[in-house]
């Protein structure tokens, strides 16, 4: 997958870049596996803004993705590699030997005609899904379950993967994309390989309107608002806000730890590293 830069025929296209989509083999989705989604643009049931910076966007169909990969022992053939507007990674339409079609997350390198399989007896091969205790240490995996049978929840975005670092009793240690090391039950399923569309983060949006197509509205700083709208607002002329940075609801931000403890924290072996460049 490569990135194509547009010629600067207009000011808005000067830094504009798009994916070339050479891996995509089908444009129209498989209709039985699509659904209509009700987009609320960040509004609640009374029409009030519940999530800021969300607005109208292009229409899209929801693709029903199989995150569980629970058809054990039945081989499937990859029919198409498709674009999904609801996620950054590409998806693949697979047809099982019993005739059932399903969408799965497409790993990088998966091609039309490839055979994939799920289950403890599956081969260690790109696109196959196995329990973590059946996968060798050092293997790149994605779409990893946190709870047995719930479906993949970890490493589902474009180009992401986790690495199996160690096995200890009933648990397997995973190094996650955030550099966090976490223990997961050995019965949880994971898919071999890293996800497709790894150049997704290199795309330059290029113009404001393109973000509006995605449903993203502008982000306004608190110090330029009125006092009624934000704790940092108001003042005569340009001000610093007059206090430590806070959210619109008065909660400290920029360095203040807001992460709550939860029972699953005991499975974290090593916390994620801080991003010094942020």
UniProtKB/Swiss-Prot annotation:
Annotated transmembrane regions: none
Gene Ontology MF: a single term: structural constituent of ribosome
Alphabetized SMART domains for the sequence: Ribosomal_L2, Ribosomal_L2_C
GO BP field: cytoplasmic translation
Domain of life: Bacteria
Record's keyword terms, sorted: Ribonucleoprotein, Ribosomal protein, RNA-binding, rRNA-binding
CC per GO annotation: large ribosomal subunit
Region (Disordered): 224-262
Family: Belongs to the universal ribosomal protein uL2 family.
Role, per record: One of the primary rRNA binding proteins. Required for association of the 30S and 50S subunits to form the 70S ribosome, for tRNA binding and peptide bond formation. It has been suggested to have peptidyltransferase activity; this is somewhat controversial. Makes several contacts with the 16S rRNA in the 70S ribosome.
PANTHER family reported in the protein's UniProt record: LARGE RIBOSOMAL SUBUNIT PROTEIN UL2M, RIBOSOMAL PROTEIN L2
Subunit structure, as described in the record: Part of the 50S ribosomal subunit. Forms a bridge to the 30S subunit in the 70S ribosome.
NCBIfam families (UniProt xref): rplB_bact
Name by which UniProt lists this protein: Large ribosomal subunit protein uL2
């Amino acid at each position: 997958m490569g990135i194509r830069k547009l010629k600067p025929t207009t000011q808005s296209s000067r830094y504009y870049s798009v994916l070339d989509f050479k891996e995509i083999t089908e444009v129209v989705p498989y209709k039985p596996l699509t659904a209509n989604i009700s987009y609320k643009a960040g509004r609640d049931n009374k029409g009030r803004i519940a999530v800021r910076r969300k607005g109208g966007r292009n229409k899209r169909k929801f693709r029903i993705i199989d995150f569980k990969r629970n058809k054990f022992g039945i081989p499937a053939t990859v029919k198409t590699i498709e674009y999904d507007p609801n996620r950054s990674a590409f998806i693949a339409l697979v047809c099982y030997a019993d005739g059932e079609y399903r969408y799965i997350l497409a790993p990088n390198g998966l091609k039309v005609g490839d055979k994939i399989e799920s289950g403890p007896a599956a081969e260690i091969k790109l696109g196959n899904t196995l329990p973590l205790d059946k996968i060798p240490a050092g293997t790149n995996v994605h779409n990893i379950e946190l709870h047995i049978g719930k479906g993949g929840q970890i490493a589902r975005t474009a180009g992401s993967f986790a690495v199996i670092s160690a096995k200890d009793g009933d648990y397997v240690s995973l190094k996650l994309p955030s550099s966090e090391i976490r223990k997961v039950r050995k019965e949880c399923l994971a898919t071999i390989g890293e996800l497709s569309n790894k150049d997704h983060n290199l795309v330059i949006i290029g113009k404001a309107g393109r973000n509006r197509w995605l449903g993203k509205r502008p982000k306004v700083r608190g110090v330029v608002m009125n006092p009624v709208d934000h704790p940092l607002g108001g003042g005569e002329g340009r001000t610093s806000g007059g206090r430590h940075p806070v959210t619109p609801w008065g909660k400290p931000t920029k360095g203040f730890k807001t992460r709550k403890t939860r029972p699953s924290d005991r499975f974290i072996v090593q916390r994620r590293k801080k991003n010094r460049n942020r």
